[in-house]
Amino acid sequence: MKSEQEVLEQIGIKLKEIRISKGYSSYEDFALEHGIARMQYWRLEAGKSNPTIKTLYRVLEIHQVSLQEFFSEGF
């Protein structure tokens, strides 16, 4: 079983991969365009923050990815 930190890092890696695949090269541009605090979003991608389901759902909704899709691989 993975540690909490490993899970947070994996969430961050997947968020970054999705963001880049959707055409956002900069986390800053993505955050600003969608009204998310820049540093809050950076912490999510860096695995330095434990997102609430509400926050994760909001980010995934922007990317048109369901929670089920997000957690289907790598966890």
Question: Which positions does each model-derived feature cover?
Answer:
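Residues within the helices of the helix-turn-helix
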Residues: 16, 28, 57
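Short alpha-helical DNA-recognition segment
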Residues: 23-43
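Key DNA-contact positions within bacterial/archaeal DNA-binding proteins
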Residues: 39-42, 49, 68
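A short, Lys/Arg-rich alpha-helix, primarily the initiator
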Residues: 1-22
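DNA major-groove recognition helix of helix-turn-helix/homeodomain DNA-binding modules
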Residues: 52-69
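The alpha-helix within a helix-turn-helix
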Residues: 19, 31, 60
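Residue-level signal for the short linker/turn that defines the boundary of a DNA-recognition helix
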Residues: 13, 24-26, 51-54
